[in-house]
Amino acid sequence: MIRLFIDTATKTFALGARVDDKEKTIDLGNPKKVLELTHVGIQKLGEERNFTRPEIKEYYCLLGPGSNTGIRLGLTIPRTVYAMDPTIRIYGIETRKLLSAEADSAVLSDRNGNLFYFDKDRKESHIRIRKEDIASYPFKGTIAVEDSDSVSKEALKGKNIVSVNVLSLRRKHKDLFIDFSDKEEEYLPEYARKI
């Protein structure tokens, strides 16, 4: 089975494919060109791993908050495919839940350099922290930071950070993802359901 991972919540827009036991990730770069580059990225992954878009049966998305508006963009790609092929499965997870699966808390920066703090024990989904307040913020335990998030890593220098790869976490914590496949009425526009 071919699985596609769509990372819309970290600093770079990335696609990752898992075919059998082999993985490949590509960075699509400029978030402003994401929708135009997605098809090209999927095609490139397919050429490198010998599959075509119709063979992708599972889509995994980060739902934000984060750099590229999370749920809006993260689910737009697979739900467009879903409108044409309702047999695909769509899974999503809040970025904080995935990152926090590896540490006591997590920090993620968006493309504007804002920092978001997630703590497993807090009721709020996230707290926005100014860079100048990082040094005095009472972090607890280990802090998960995405591998490519240089803004968060720099701001947290000297703190107990754990660098994580979201594609690897998707594989490791698949059970944490929410299955949106049978809930299309909750996220698919009405006109698409009538096609």
Question: What do the predicted segments below correspond to?
Answer:
Residues 1-61, 142-145:
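N-terminal beta-alpha supersecondary unit
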Residues 1-20, 90-195:
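Oxyanion-binding and handling regions
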Residues 27, 72, 128-129:
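Short linear motifs in exposed loops
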Residues 31-34, 67, 99:
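Alpha-helix N-cap/loop-to-helix initiation residues
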Residues 37-40, 72, 76-80, 97-98:
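Short amphipathic alpha-helical face segments that pack within enzyme cores
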Residues 43, 79, 153:
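Short glycine-/small-residue-rich flexible loop motifs, especially phosphate/cofactor-binding loops
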Residues 58-90:
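DPxDG-like acidic metal-binding loop motif
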